[in-house]
From Swiss-Prot:
Protein name: Mannonate dehydratase
Gene transcribed to yield this protein: uxuA
NCBIfam families: PRK03906.1 (NF003027), uxuA (TIGR00695)
Function: Catalyzes the dehydration of D-mannonate.
EC number of the protein: 4.2.1.8
Biological processes per GO annotation: D-glucuronate catabolic process
Pathway as given in its UniProt record: Carbohydrate metabolism; pentose and glucuronate interconversion
Record field: transmembrane: none
Organism: Photobacterium profundum (strain SS9)
Length: 394
């Protein structure tokens, strides 16, 4: 696997020099300063590429070129945004970048209720608490028809949870859910957030699928001509939330997506933390079935809790994800590609990491502190080396 690291650009508290010392060789990056929908010019791409390469690193994956909300709802200027997206892909390809991670989640990218969940060892992790989320949706946001998303027991627990919240607790939970997290390009007030949700009224799962297929079919001629791989990131959490449809959550969704858009350039990001939050997702089987479409991997683990819809982010080799067999299957796919003449390694980044040690005293991007990811990368690197020496001849 190619060892990569997500970097948020010049304003990231983790520098390119730090990343080199972590042992990563590839950078996962995006031009966050360009507004959603606008074209990434070759000039801007080359400036960022030179900045990365000057440190002896490679811009391996774009994560991500954001998909404008009007593309997802297929309203307003959606065709203009698609045309701009196509031009951005052309420009990336001409600048030598061939892998783009993106998502098709409405409104929010990834969602957590707690950004500072304390682990037994004192480190801090990200957490999704189903009851806290229900309290937000039912009693803070007060989304119409939200009751239908929760059982009677969950509604009762959410009411107790809400009744025990202070104003500061409410503000913190609200901020955690609706403020733009790393990777989400937008932040919303409560009123703006509800207005964004309202834009999806009447958009069912089938309708969102239709819009995604239209979008990808527009892109594929450019991707096919330039060998540019689109790697969709799964929904996080991998289920409908806030009344919004989710369409990249299970192996059935991948089956559908690859059947509807059969181009080999239509691929996936295997995010083990996102897919792994569902107990019915067999990650190892997903890799076996769709390994030829995996162009990027995010390796992390989650631990589901007593309420199986609640989870926290575990250490990379702990939790519910069978990281041993996940890495084994990725290495088998790399071996298959190598035998077929494709020598490029699959880019892998240690996704998220616990805030620990000296980082506990620093301002960090939630999930993206340096030391926790350094630990995760080292653990996965060691696992990979052991598997290669034991089972692989090349």
């Amino acid at each position: 696997m190619e060892q990569t690291w997500r970097w948020y650009g010049p304003n990231d508290p983790v520098s390119l020099n730090d990343i080199r010392q972590a042992g990563a060789t590839g950078i996962v990056n995006a031009l966050h300063h360009i507004p959603n929908g606008e074209v990434w010019t070759k000039e801007e791409i080359l400036i960022r590429k030179a900045l990365i390469e000057d440190k002896g690193l490679t811009w391996s994956v774009v994560e991500s070129v954001p998909v404008h909300e009007e593309i997802k709802t297929q309203t307003g200027n959606y065709q203009l945004w698609i045309d701009n997206y196509k031009q951005t892909l052309r420009n990336l390809a001409e600048c030598g970048i061939d892998t783009v991670c993106y998502n098709f989640m409405p409104v929010l990218d990834w969602t957590r209720t707690d950004l500072e969940f304390e682990m037994d060892d004192g480190s801090k992790a990200l957490r999704f608490d189903q009851i806290a989320f229900a309290a937000f949706e039912l009693h803070i946001l007060k989304r119409p028809s939200a009751e239908g998303a929760y059982s009677d027991e969950e509604q009762a627990q959410a009411k107790i949870y809400f009744d025990n919240m202070s104003d500061a607790d409410i503000a913190k939970l609200t901020g955690n859910i609706i403020a733009g997290l790393p990777g989400a390009e937008e932040g919303y007030t409560l009123q703006e957030f509800q207005a964004q949700l309202d834009l999806y009224d009447g958009i069912t799962k089938d309708k969102l699928r239709e819009h995604m297929v239209y979008f990808l079919k527009e892109l594929m001629p450019i991707c096919d001509a330039n060998g540019l791989k689109m790697a969709v990131h799964p929904d996080d959490p991998p289920r409908p939330i806030l009344g919004l449809p989710r369409i990249v959550s299970t192996i059935e969704d991948i089956d559908w997506l690859t059947a509807e858009v059969p181009s080999q350039m239509n691929g996936i990001t295997m995010c083990t933390g996102s897919y792994g939050a569902r107990g019915d997702n067999d990650l190892v089987n997903m890799i076996r079935q769709h390994g030829d479409r995996i162009y990027f991997t995010h390796l992390r683990s989650t631990q589901r809790e007593d309420n199986q819809l609640s989870f926290h982010e575990a250490a990379h080799l702990d939790g519910d994800v069978d990281m041993y067999n996940v890495v084994m299957e990725i290495l088998k796919e790399e071996q298959r590609r190598d035998d077929a003449g494709d020598v490029r390694l699959i880019p892998m980044r240690p996704d998220h990491g616990h805030q620990m040690l000296d980082d506990l005293n620093k301002k960090t991007n939630p999930g993206y502190s340096a030391i926790g990811r350094l630990k995760g990368l080292a653990e996965v690197r060691g696992l990979e080396m052991a598997l290669k020496r034991a089972f692989f001849t090349k």
